[in-house]
Amino acid sequence: MDLLANVPSWSDIERSLDQKFSAVNQSIHQGLQSANDSWHGFSRRVSDGAGQAYGYLGGHRIDNVQQALAMSYPIFQEDLKRKWASIGIEQILPVLLQLVKEVSMILGGSIAVGSAAGGAIGALAFGVGAAPGAVAGAGIGLEVGNLILLALGLSAIAEYFIKGLPVCLATLQEGIATAWNAEEGVKPAGLDPTGGSVAVIQERTERAARQLARGQEQLVLLLLMAIVTYLLRGQMKAGIMGSMENIATRSAKLQADIANKQFGAWLAKNEAKLLAHPDLQIKGPTPVKKPEPLQPARQPEKASAPKPVAKPAVMSLREAVGNQTADRWISTGRRIADFTDPKRSALLTDDQIGALHGYTTNEGYQWINPALRGQTPLSPQMEAFVTHANEGLAKLPSYTLGDTFRGTTLPEDVMSRMQVGLPTSDAAFLSTSADRALAFNGNVKMTLQGVTGKDISFLSGHREAEVLFGPGTRFNVVDRVDNGSVTQFILKEIP
């Protein structure tokens, strides 16, 4: 893939953002004429503010982002090879790696310039939010999505691909934001003889790398799902097309349009495997299959006793989140739990303790809770993670030492539904603290009278006295007090 023939590196941006983003515009004029007008306008908005960028930023932020990106690519490749070996993904790894590098470069460069122009990460007018961690919007998703599809020759799948792209870009932006702010709140490395600052910066950069790898993997999954959906349904404007003849016609058209020959050859070879892969199946109306030939009538057989149906095996934590992440969560969680409470540690399998410890990390709960709330897609890997965490919670004794507390920020529409006498619940895991002083701040403070909460502080490594409730736990609103900017609730669990 050659999305941008002369796409600049982070070193180029560090030396001169203005000069190098102008080079991006020039490179587009040398090729990809069909994408010229769109990209020229897109990159012009990036380069408009680039003249002041380097002087405002300095080099350390870009260095940290560059390091996180470099660390993310091996994680991304390993996860792809493990999860998608059945469809020969290794054959197009160079194409996919180039794709995610260029998308990260576009998004990261946009954020860099936006930070200089707006004083906060991503302060640009074309869709990326003005605050760290804000979600990349439809504007940048549309423009970047069109560039990707034009370069690959996959414009036919645009409706399905672009619709899901902002979620992928949001995950990538989250990783870039984590690396960008890696040095916030710590002493400069040269002024900290203990080495603690260096360790904190490195931990944040590694976390950013894992977030970036996850966003890159989401991008590839979206591309594959868009291809499968197009082959099965056709373009949205044409309606749902179900016959095998139409699938064959669409397949031939798609392969004829593909600009990257390596990608086209891979698709031709693995199309049947793609269409049959369970993780790429689409929801909604399914294609109409050819009628099967009639079979000779069989004589009725004597009814036999039904055989018990084996429960399908849940994928391991390593299969769900990758070997590196799973091993780190399992080893860290087990080490902390064995030291803090060996008896409770012995109750949990490695997958269960790894999932619960992983949830207590920023990367864990920020990954799973939005999906449980329906804000991001819930993949089979996420479902496996939830299963291991729930099974681990079920083995632990309930917390019985009193009320727990939670501070959070809720939008007005959610708060308006939390009225005295009505039930309420969160589709995600619900984190609370046994210590009122350790509960997080926000516009809402809750006192929870729980029954099924489990103390997981013995495996977390954080001093938050965390008591965790499973997804969907239901509470009654016993009391509500609106006190200026803070609303206080008393919630009692419904047995």
Curated annotation (Swiss-Prot):
One of its GO terms (molecular function) is nucleotidyltransferase activity. It is found in: Secreted; Host cytoplasm. Residues 278-309 are annotated as: Disordered. Its EC number is 2.4.2.31. The active site is at R406, S431, E466. It comes from the Bacteria. One of its GO terms (cellular component) is host cell cytoplasm. PROSITE patterns: TR_MART. InterPro entries: ART, Tre1-like_N. Residues 344-495 are annotated as: ART domain. It holds the Pfam family DUF6861. Keywords: Glycosyltransferase, Host cytoplasm, Nucleotidyltransferase, Secreted, Toxin, Transferase, Virulence. Residues 315-495 form the TR mART core domain. It catalyses: L-arginyl-[protein] + NAD(+) = N(omega)-(ADP-D-ribosyl)-L-arginyl-[protein] + nicotinamide + H(+). Belongs to the Arg-specific ADP-ribosyltransferase family. The ART domain is toxic when expressed as a protein fragment. Toxic component of a contact-dependent interbacterial competition system (also called effector-immunity systems). Acts by ADP-ribosylating a number of target proteins in target cells; E.coli target proteins include FtsZ, EFTu, RNase E, Fis, YegQ, GuaB and IF2. This is NAD(+)--protein-arginine ADP-ribosyltransferase Tre1. The lineage of its organism: Bacteria, Pseudomonadati, Pseudomonadota, Gammaproteobacteria, Pseudomonadales.
